[in-house]
Amino acid sequence: MHYCNKDIGSFGETIAVDYIKNCGYIILEKNFRCKLGEIDIIAKDKNFIVFIEVKTRYSYIYGSPSEAITFRKQNKIYKTAQLYIIKKAIHNKFYFRFDVIEVILNTLNSNYSVKLIKNAFQI
């Protein structure tokens, strides 16, 4: 069962949302967009606001999904997060963290694996 990249990404984000809800996160935003970029998921985990990038792949053949998050991409996520923090006026109310969720889909059936990488990068 193969999909185009956009479909794979959307499916992975759905899996990621379910996964972090089960971990106790509260979803605040999905696909937050602004002129600077996009953040897949923004969630609350205890006293942290967590900005989450989801990467979905069918295999590790080209490395782990998180390896696709270059420094340039991290910087875009960071700047987008700054705008969100300012827009919501939450800079003094929470700690902030950048997590990555890797979703690996099985090409033979509907199974998948999920890996949450907390505090995956800092800028």
UniProtKB/Swiss-Prot annotation:
Disulfide bonds: none annotated. It holds the Pfam family UPF0102. One of its GO terms (molecular function) is nucleic acid binding. It comes from the Bacteria. Belongs to the UPF0102 family. This is UPF0102 protein CLM_2733.
